[in-house]
Amino acid sequence: MGESQSKQESNTRVAQHGSQQDVDPTFQTKRALERERSSPQVEQSFLGQLQSLLGWSSTSKDVPLSQLIREMDHESRRHSHQSKKKLDRSEHISEGTIPEIYEKRKETISHTQSMEQKYLFQNFTKLLLLQKCCPGGSEKLVRESWHPCVPEEGGHMIEIQDLFDPNLDTEKKPQLVIIEGAAGIGKSTLARQVKRAWDEGQLYRDRFQHVFFFSCRELAQCKQLSLAELIAQGQEVPTAPTRQILSRPEKLLFILDGIDEPAWVLEDQNPELCVHWSQAQPVHTLLGSLLGKSILPEASLMLTARTTALQKLVPSLGQPHRVEVLGFSEFERKDYFYKYFAKERNTIIDFNLIGSIPVLLTLCEVPWVCWLLCTCLEKQMQQGEVLSLTSQTTTALCLKYLSLTIPGQHLSTQLRTLCSLAAEGICQRRTLFSKSDLCKQGLAEDAIATFLKIGVLQRQPSSLSYSFAHLCLQEFFAAMSYILEDSEEAHGDMGNDRTVETLVERYGRQNLFEAPTVRFLLGLLNTREMREMENIFACKFPWETKLKLLRSIIGEPFCQPCHLGLFHCLYENQEEELLTETMLCFPLTASGPNHMEATVFQTNVKRLVIQTDMELMVVTFCITFSHVRSLRLKGKGQQEYKLTAPAMVLYRWTPISEASWKVLFSNLKCTRNLEELDLSGNPLSYSAVRSLCTALRQPGCRLKTLWLVDCGLTSRCCSFLASMLSAHSRLAELDLRLNDLGDNGVRQLCEGLRNPACNLSILRLDQASLSEQVITELRALETKNPKLFISSTWMSHMTMPTENTDGEESLTSSKQQQQQSGDKHMEPLGTDDDFWGPSGPVSTEVVDRERNLYRVRLPMAGSYHCPSTGLHFVVTRAVTIEIGFCAWSQFLHETPLQHSHMVAGPLFDIKAEHGAVTAVCLPHFVSLQEGKVDSSLFHVAHFQDHGMVLETPARVEPHFAVLENPSFSPMGVLLRMIPAVGHFIPITSITLIYYRLYLEDITFHLYLVPNDCTIRKAIDEEELKFQFVRINKPPPVDALYVGSRYIVSSSKEVEILPKELELCYRSPRESQLFSEIYVGNIGSGINLQLTDKKYMNLIWEALLKPGDLRPALPRMASAPKDAPALLHFVDQHREQLVARVTSVDPLLDKLHGLVLSEEDYETVRAEATNQDKMRKLFRGSRSWSWDCKDHFYQALKETHPHLIMDLLEKSGGVSVRL
């Protein structure tokens, strides 16, 4: 019997924790990742894991592991080797380091501790955790689906070590932590992790002396227990006498896992009647007293329960910390697959299969579904089948699992019996069954043995009871039981009515659609799934039974608020007829006979809070069958546009995965009534834009308006947008503002706009950073196509939300700027070093050039962004900010993090008045495209007097990390490196080209460096010493890898030394790598190229023309305000400017709003000739400040560059103030 049980546990991959009997598949992996790593079978799987961790595409699959290892530096391999541990095969591996000291989500590493390198290695299944707000106590524990007004912030993401951190509002440490979430999402996994981490000395040792873990399903088997017996059950090994344990109740933590599973009512008894700790009492009374604080009021508790069960579970829970488990991130989903199939040679094939089906990848955010999918793939391998999964729902995946595991149809009768057992258990809230329970139900001994062997059932080793492998699996079998019963019912609708009554009695009408059993039931009533059931059970189901049962379950939900659970049920069902009938009956239509414009406060704009990829998928799937005409996915800092009713606004505060974007856009291929889509404020990767444009090109897509404001789009995305414009005739309005498209990107858009099939009538984009040539192309397009209106306002490249006086979120410098500017094509433009804010550019002052110190005086509350540095501040009032450029080498070498973290952005020393800055964006150069790097690996390092502090950013965007309510010191972004991966991190890089003319010979210097403003500035200053001038050319489009080598080549015979460039990070104070290129005669031009040395693919090229080569500009002289005798450049050359400026109107457009008022602007324009306009302009300039004349000079340089260059050469300098 023992041997059989051991074999059964091996086959079913049962993971157990001490006395815990409940199997959670998130602990179930096939083998430990590092077992026999040197064997040839493991090499391919280890390579697969590297590819999963880095998000490498399948094109890298033929790279030998040995070659990858050789390319990692010695230090990385040493760290990797030390950090790997051989784990029990039942544990799920998720490598990472957890610092020893935590304080409000920060880790402090003092200089003395840094030498010791006290890193604690953990192997946790990493889950997404959302700390939820609970302002009014626990009277509203369940998240509602519909919101009549704009919802408040939904909380913030935390990690396992933050569960007992003080409340941000009260600063009190919580005594009660509720771990909530959907079925199978990983609540029990998290609870076990807390216990195991405490056992291993990694978490909460300073707070708790004793931690007790209890499975409530097991506790429910006990009739009575004393407090002493309860404590004894919670310890694997007795550690101290009970009296000693109870002497310090504030040091105790009780973990109650699955407190909602048993059918008990936890009632707190009268404190005056409390019995002695050694006296037995009913278990539900004992637990109720613990929760009600009648006994051990100072003790802490952690509960796990499904979200829908919380409200009725305990009437009053005081002020708990509520943490919702959101499942796996996309990164962890892929990682799980690799670790499950650690030794299989087909690991890469499996990954490509799963990655190619984004719906499956989205479903796998639920850890239980991850296990289910991997089990199905494993069964297919064992049976020699071609690996193929086309399941679109969890129900379909469960049926696939059943068909792969049930050995033939001879067990169909016993399988029906097992379904009846499951349904009876669900109705009675029982998950453990005795041997007699199974026999009474009619299960034979051989059938029980078979179900144990294939893993559907499992035996509890600490008792004689049995359970299903997972509660969700029991609920699936229960759902099949209801269909089997209804198909056998001989009394017409009585079976349907009885089923619905049973479900309502068990779950309640309000939570009916949240119950997994009901979702499975709706999924089984799909035509395809019913055929699969017929094959499994060798029977036929009457189709009228299906239709009647569907309508009985759905009932009349249309008069009630829409439930997110109902969307889940409809998604599981997938029947178009039912979806259309149900969704068209929702009260989403406008109040009048005609469609009307709706603001966000109108009742016909519905709001729904979604937290996970799965929720986003099911909601957008169902919306395509409804009356909804406008859909907004609200991102951070998004401007509110008017939506056409009926409309829906989806609120989400957690990142959206690549797979989820693909699913969402796939749903848009046939939109029926949906005409407007607003994705503003949501970062879109290159692949996401590609999926979006693919959907928009489909004939069934009816979208007419698309808002993509501040989505992190680059010129690389514009090829897809242009192709979409050429093929999609319905799209009439496209908003691309606050995206860094550049000249190349806009030129690609112009190609799409020229296509006769393009029906676009309104295009909004920023033109402030575009060249005059591109702006001319846009104007020519408007002239050629009178129906096309290209709208532009000047504004910063990024925006962030600020709060107005009503506490509502608004977008700084967007709508207000549009009104101020009159929506002109050209707006005033400052230099790249300026900070762009609500009232225009704000100049940056040089405090000490040698020490790289600068100052900016922000004049009012709002959002300010500097394109040159990438810094972004949100301030509540006027404030002066000092900014210093620092070098990481000054600070990082004194900490142990130089081996575990890599520099991910520039280091700034920022000083500002405390409380004036509510948010700061710190730039980073790590590429987040394609989901290759997990954003949870980012930290912001603060270097303070007492040591270094690592802070977790509030969020990480494609180009910057956001800190809210920051404190300032030397600070910058770091990225935690994954052990054994080393420096294989994709980064955004730039090329810098400098030249020097000597007679007819030209010398070029070519650099390839990370996109770091401090490095760029250091190179600029070094090259200037030798009179080299920089040429601006576009950077590489694709992300590159640190440590990679590239071949420098040219279209002409030139001398290049060296001929290879390595992309590496060097501190700004160190010498940077470059190639020197000697050209005798440039002729008509020269083409420079960089080619990947390993894969020989072209990664960058640039054409250098003779027109790019101009004499070096003399350094601009500083002109302080107390030196009036020094004339400004525009005053020195007044006569020449009046005579030679040939195009005054563009010049006036640039000065309008900054230098010229509306009245001055019109007065100058009213003059007849250009010379008269210039004379009028100079007459008004007598009252201008030096700053105004600086703006005049900048405008002249933009509109008449050749004239300004000629004047500079003749005068030998220019007097403006930097």
From Swiss-Prot:
Annotated site location: Cleavage: 968-969
Any GO MF annotation of the entry: molecular condensate scaffold activity
E.C. number(s) listed in UniProt: 3.4.-.-
UniProt region (ZU5), positions on chain: 835-968
Site note Trigger for autolytic processing, residues: 942
Biased composition (Basic residues): 77-87
Domain CARD, residue spans: 1122-1211
Region (Disordered): 1-44, 71-91, 799-842
Residues covered by region (UPA): 969-1118
Transmembrane stretches, start-end: none
Residue ranges with Polar residues bias: 1-29, 799-815
BP term (GO), one: defense response to virus
Keywords associated with the record: ATP-binding, Cytoplasm, Hydrolase, Immunity, Inflammasome, Inflammatory response, Innate immunity, Leucine-rich repeat, Necrosis, Nucleotide-binding, Nucleus, Protease, Repeat, Ubl conjugation
Pfam family, one: LRR_6
Gene3D superfamilies in the record: Death Domain, Fas, P-loop containing nucleotide triphosphate hydrolases, Ribonuclease Inhibitor
First and last residues of every LRR repeat: 343-364, 673-693, 730-750
Free-text activity regulation comment from the record: Activated by pathogens and other damage-associated signals: activation promotes ubiquitination and degradation of the N-terminal part, releasing the cleaved C-terminal part of the protein (NACHT, LRR and PYD domains-containing protein 1a, C-terminus), which polymerizes and forms the Nlrp1a inflammasome. Nlrp1a inflammasome is inhibited by DPP8 and DPP9, which sequester the C-terminal fragment of Nlrp1a (NACHT, LRR and PYD domains-containing protein 1a, C-terminus) in a ternary complex, thereby preventing Nlrp1a oligomerization and activation.
InterPro entries in the record: CARD (IPR001315), CARD8/ASC/NALP1_CARD (IPR033516), DEATH-like_dom_sf (IPR011029), FIIND_dom (IPR025307), Leu-rich_rpt (IPR001611), LRR_dom_sf (IPR032675), NACHT_NTPase (IPR007111), NLRP_HD2 (IPR041267)
Function: Acts as the sensor component of the Nlrp1a inflammasome, which mediates inflammasome activation in response to various pathogen-associated signals, leading to subsequent pyroptosis. Inflammasomes are supramolecular complexes that assemble in the cytosol in response to pathogens and other damage-associated signals and play critical roles in innate immunity and inflammation. Acts as a recognition receptor (PRR): recognizes specific pathogens and other damage-associated signals, such as Val-boroPro inhibitor, and mediates the formation of the inflammasome polymeric complex.
Domain notes: The leucine-rich repeat (LRR) domain may be involved in autoinhibition in the absence of activating signal, possibly through intramolecular interaction with the NACHT domain. The FIIND (domain with function to find) region is involved in homomerization, but not in CASP1-binding. Autocatalytic cleavage in this region occurs constitutively, prior to activation signals, and is required for inflammasome activity (IL1B release), possibly by facilitating CASP1 binding. Both N- and C-terminal fragments remain associated.
Quaternary context: Interacts (via LRR repeats) with BCL2 and BCL2L1 (via the loop between motifs BH4 and BH3). Interacts with NOD2; this interaction is enhanced in the presence of muramyl dipeptide (MDP) and increases IL1B release. Interacts with EIF2AK2/PKR; this interaction requires EIF2AK2 activity, is accompanied by EIF2AK2 autophosphorylation and promotes inflammasome assembly in response to danger-associated signals. Interacts with MEFV; this interaction targets Nlrp1a to degradation by autophagy, hence preventing excessive IL1B- and IL18-mediated inflammation.
Family: Belongs to the NLRP family.
UniProt protein name: NACHT, LRR and PYD domains-containing protein 1a allele 4
Organism: Rattus norvegicus (Rat)
Upper taxonomic lineage: Eukaryota, Metazoa, Chordata, Craniata, Vertebrata
